[in-house]
Amino acid sequence: KYVVFLFYTYKIGIMNKLSREKMCKKEKKEILRILLPPIFTFLLNSVVYWGAPLIKTGIVAHNLSSSVDRIVPFMPQFIIIYFGCYIFWVVNYLLIAAQKEEHRYQFFTADFYARLICFVCFVFFPTTNTRPELTGSDIFTGAVRFLYQIDKPVNLFPSIHCMASWFCCIGLRKCENIPKWYQNLSEIIAVLVFISTLALRQHVLVDVFSGILVAEATWQIS
C-alpha cells in the first residue's frame, strides 16, 4: 500500500507540474497576443512618420492654416497634454488588444489602413505650418522649444496625434468590460489632445478633422 501511495503521489506531482507548465505557456501566449499588435503599430508608425520625409517628390508643401486657426491662442501649457497623450495611447491600445479577437482584429486592421493613408498623404500632399517665435523662459515654453527642435513642421495632414487619440475612443466602443466612465474620460482626453495640437501650433483645424475622419472611415471599412 505504501508503494501504491508513493506511486499515486508521484503521478499527481507530475500531473500538477505539467498543468503548471501548460498554464505558463498559455499565459505567455496571452501576453504575446496582447503585446504584439501595439508593438507592430508602434513600429509601423515610426516607418510612416520618419520614412515619409525621406522620399523626395519635389512637391511644394501646402500651408492649410486659415483665419479660424489664428483665433486659438498659443498656450504652451498644453505641452503637458501633448506629451502626456503617449501614456494615454499605450494604455488604451493595450486595453483594446486585450479584447475579443474579432474586435481586436477590426481595430488593428483599421489602424493599419489609417497609417498607410497617412503615409500616402505625407508623401504626395506634404503640408507645413507657421510656428510662433518663442521668447518665454518658463518651463512650458522651454518644453515647446524642445518639441520644435525634434519635430519639424512636416507630416501634418492628417494629424497622427488626433487620429491615434480618436482611435483610443473608437476601440473602446461597445466594450462592456470597459467602464462607461473610462470611455467618457477617453473622449475628454482625446478632445484635449485636439486642442493641444492647435494651441501649440503643431497642427491646424484641417489636420485635426482629417485625422478624426481617417480613423472613423478605416474603422467602418475594416
What are these regions (language model features)?
Residues 6-8:
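Short hydrophobic targeting helices and cationic amphipathic motifs
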Residues 16-88, 144:
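N-terminal transmembrane-helix/juxtamembrane module of multi-pass inner/ER membrane proteins
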Residues 29, 33-41, 105-113, 182-186, ...:
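Alpha-helical transmembrane segments of integral membrane proteins
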Residues 39-51, 88, 108, 112, ...:
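Hydrophobic, lipid-facing residues on alpha-helical transmembrane segments of integral membrane proteins
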Residues 46-47, 115-121, 188-199:
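Aromatic-anchored segments of alpha-helical transmembrane domains
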Residues 52-67, 97-181:
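Membrane-interface loops
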Residues 90-94, 162-178, 186, 212-222:
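Membrane-interfacial alpha-helical segments at the cytosolic side of multi-pass membrane proteins
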Residues 153-157, 192-218:
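Interfacial helix-loop-helix junctions of multi-pass membrane proteins
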